[in-house]
UniProtKB/Swiss-Prot annotation:
One of its GO terms (biological process) is DNA replication. It holds the Pfam family DnaB_C. ATP binds at A195, R196, P197, G198, M199, G200, K201, T202. This is Replicative DNA helicase. SUPFAM superfamilies: N-terminal domain of DnaB helicase, P-loop containing nucleoside triphosphate hydrolases. InterPro entries: DNA_heli_DnaB-like_N_sf, DNA_helicase_DnaB-like_C, DNA_helicase_DnaB-like_N, DNA_helicase_N/primase_C, P-loop_NTPase. It catalyses: Couples ATP hydrolysis with the unwinding of duplex DNA at the replication fork by translocating in the 5'-3' direction. This creates two antiparallel DNA single strands (ssDNA). The leading ssDNA polymer is the template for DNA polymerase III holoenzyme which synthesizes a continuous strand; ATP + H2O = ADP + phosphate + H(+). It comes from Salmonella phage P22. Renders P22 DNA replication independent of a functional dnaB gene of the host. The keyword Glycoprotein does not apply.
Length: 458
């Protein structure tokens, strides 16, 4: 059966010539998809001929295949009745190839998983997950679409936004001033939150996660879901941060519960209740590859269709692929995160460190040029949000109580700065005009600045 289908693809290409359908098949199918050596060789020659000479000629293909295959190639062409179902047969060949790859991988990994030591078996299972996610699925046909056809879809989008009002199809962070600048996150966005250590990256990310998970998907009555890959903090620490944030308490208070009064315990209970009601999931793992992150996210999206945001804390802790240079590895990770957002139709937020060079400047407010390791992060990101707190450098500054959330890139909107008070390690809304005046006017002398203030939260 498999041989007949593969023969039908080769025969259809040979008798049909270089039609648009044939071009689609040549663009989406790989020679390795053919299990029969004869057809694999014939497909390689056909594709080479189509690319180099812009034609498919049966006699020329047979000749280039050599004496071993020439006669069989011509017989394949003669025995094919029609090229009418070429695309359907090609899809069957691609599906069969993917199944063979999966079965071969399972056979290869069965022994080390079944009979290896506990550690070796665990490593083998990790390798199985990674390689399964790397098996390329058969590519769907890619073709141009006329703008006139897309306009109908966009009309539906506008109508949905009109009906839903503030609850549009962009994802809101829960920080009103930030949403006013960015317009919210689109379904395919990669958002980077970057800062030097101690500025509050993780705290801001968790605040956004809570803001997203507190909202309902328009028209469904179902709350939005969030998936957090926490590679720096344990799941317990994430919960602790969440409870502290909900109760507007310092994390240090929760670490000394014997000192809490009744009001403190009431805040803890309220925070626990709030977090328990949110559909927020945490993957607690110190090292994950970007392929593993994608595999887990795909499975979670299938099981929980309300998943609305994926968060990775942080980009520098994602396991790097083998590459000649570190910037190439980072480029692979950022590009893969962007592709995941696009394919899953779910925005991805990734935290990132900034270069130490920012510390060498008199004005330490970060820019996109300070992104560590690779300019590809700036290229792949749809939005970049930088954090700056004057208190990290000068606790006595008049601007010390405030945090600046700086939108330095916004592919679909404007740039700007949002101000929040930073109280007990948490971001709190404040009067924007007042904060702007104080932070703009503040210009502490370089000699008075400290590199890092004591006790800053990460």
């Amino acid at each position: 059966m498999r041989q007949d289908i593969e023969a039908s693809v080769i025969g259809g290409l040979l008798i049909g010539g270089l039609t648009p359908t044939a071009s689609d098949v040549l663009a989406t199918l790989e020679p390795e998809a053919f299990s029969i050596p004869l057809y694999r060789k014939a497909f390689e020659v056909i594709r080479k001929q189509a690319r180099n000479r812009n034609l498919i000629d049966g006699l020329m293909v047979a000749e280039e295949c050599g004496d071993e295959y020439a006669t069989a190639v011509m017989m394949t062409a003669r025995s094919c009745p029609s090229a009418a179902n070429l695309k359907g047969y090609a899809g069957m060949v691609a599906d069969s190839y993917q199944r063979r790859q999966v079965l071969q991988l399972l056979d290869e990994m069965r022994e080390p998983i079944s009979n290896g030591t506990l550690d070796a078996s665990g490593r083998a299972m990790d390798e199985l997950v990674k390689r399964l996610s790397s098996i390329r699925k058969p590519r769907n046909e890619v073709k141009p679409v006329r703008l006139g056809e897309i306009i109908n879809d966009y009309t539906d989008t506008l109508d949905r936004r009109l009906r839903n009002g503030e609850e549009s199809d962009t994802l809101k962070t829960g920080i009103e001033e930030l949403d006013a600048i960015t317009g919210g996150m689109n379904a395919e966005d990669l958002v980077i939150i970057a800062a030097r250590p101690g500025m509050g990256k993780t705290e801001l990310a968790l605040k956004i996660a809570e803001g997203v998970a507190s909202r309902v998907i328009p028209g469904s009555g179902v709350r939005r879901g969030v998936l957090i890959f926490s590679m720096e903090m344990s799941a317990i620490q994430v919960v602790e941060r969440g409870i502290a944030g909900a109760g507007m308490m310092s994390v240090s208070v929760l670490r000394n519960p014997s000192r809490m009064d009744d009001e403190g315990w009431a805040r803890v209970a309220s925070g626990m209740k709030l977090l328990a009601e949110l559909d927020v999931w945490v993957v607690d793992a110190s090292r994950l590859s970007v392929e593993e992150i994608r595999s887990i996210s795909e499975r979670h999206k299938q099981e929980h269709p309300n998943l609305s945001l994926i968060m990775a804390d942080y980009l520098g802790l994602i396991e790097k692929p083998k590459a000649e240079r570190n910037d190439l590895a980072i480029a692979h990770i950022s590009g893969s995160l962007k592709a995941m957002a696009k394919d899953l139709k779910t925005p991805v937020i990734s935290l990132s460190q900034l270069s130490r060079d920012v510390e060498k400047r008199p004005n330490k407010r970060p820019t996109n040029a300070d992104l560590r390791d690779s300019g590809s992060i700036e290229q792949d990101a749809d939005s970049i949000i930088m954090l700056y707190r004057e208190a990290v450098y000068d606790e006595n500054s008049s601007a010390a109580p405030f945090a600046e959330i700086i939108v330095t890139k916004n592919r679909f909107g404007s740039l700007g700065t949002v101000y929040q008070r930073f109280c007990n390690g948490h971001f709190v809304a404040c009067d924007q005009d007042e904060a702007r005046q104080i932070c703009t006017a503040s210009n502490a002398p370089a000699g008075r600045r400290k590199r890092y203030a004591q006790g800053a939260d990460v």
